[in-house]
């Protein structure tokens, strides 16, 4: 079977408009992109915000980096063990942690969060997303949406690496430091692979100086001030 060429793929517009979807949910969708080092508090803040939004009657969903890597962006072993993919397919479609795979990881979730937000949900994405160009690409995906630009709110979880290492809930920093000391690189963000901090995030929160409640209030106030959420 011949490969389908890009010129043979066309966008198919439905009859339901985005305004109609958003009116049904009584809210305008948006993506809130939480980025920061491992252990910085991204998921903690995103989950807490999701709970508050739900309690206030808003539809929201957290897309967590670890959770997504157990399915959509799983690595070859997980795909073979839990999805019964053949080894060749698993290696072809599975994602590891090379710079190229990290780029594809963020590209995929950028597309998924765009779909969620386009449907009217608040998509709360919690990913290290260490490379600035990948985050910029995710923003561009939202800005160039076929049915009109979708709000993309970047939230920099600016917790110092010292605090992240003290927490180290998964023991990854120690593992990475030990690997580097032994002359073996792990490509772990913040240790032997760079984290490129956002230059102009919409919001910034530091878990070493602010509580989760303060972080939630910071984001919630931003959403209220800009009309995404009622006061």
Task: Name each model-derived stretch.
Residues 1-31:
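Extreme N-terminal, non-catalytic leader segments
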Residues 34:
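Hydrophobic anchor at the beta1->P-loop junction of P-loop NTPases
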Residues 38:
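The conserved Walker
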Residues 42:
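Conserved lysine of the Walker
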Residues 47-114, 118:
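Conserved substrate/cofactor phosphate-moiety recognition/catalytic segment
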Residues 114-121, 141-150, 195-198:
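Conserved catalytic network of the ASCE P-loop NTPase/AAA+ motor domain
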Residues 125-126, 130, 145-167, 205:
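Conserved phosphate-donor/acceptor-positioning beta-strand/loop module used by diverse small-molecule
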Residues 158-161, 166-218, 226-231:
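Small-molecule kinase domains that catalyze NTP-dependent phosphoryl transfer to phosphate-bearing small molecules
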